[in-house]
Amino acid sequence: EKLGQGQQPRQWLQPRQGQQGYYPTSPQQSGQGQQLGQGQQGYYPTSPQQSGQGQQGYDSPYHVSAEHQAASLKVAKAQQLAAQLPAMCRLEGGDALLASQ
């Protein structure tokens, strides 16, 4: 009987190994949270791409008048504002912004 009781604690050690199997799941869940962060990184590149379009406006207009340069800059700024506004609407609530406008 004493030997049998000695073997039982060994069985208690095995559930600890099973708990180690549970711990990796929580880092995996936090890893899914990091994937959400990657999704946010997918939103940020849109604004640099828009600014990149503005830079394309800088490169090409050497053969174009300064008025067209100014117009292209206004369009680029308007695109950036339009990209920022939907994010603000989602954060603060579209109804409040629509009412203020």
Swiss-Prot record:
Belongs to the gliadin/glutenin family. Residues 1-65 are annotated as: Disordered. Residues 41-62 have a biased composition (Low complexity). Keywords: Disulfide bond, Repeat, Seed storage protein, Storage protein. It holds the Pfam family Glutenin_hmw. Glutenins are high-molecular weight seed storage proteins of wheat endosperm. Thought to be responsible for the visco-elastic property of wheat dough. Glutenins are coded by several genes on each of the group 1 chromosomes of wheat. GO terms for molecular function: nutrient reservoir activity. This is Glutenin, high molecular weight subunit PC256. Residues 1-27 have a biased composition (Polar residues). Disulfide-bridge linked aggregates.
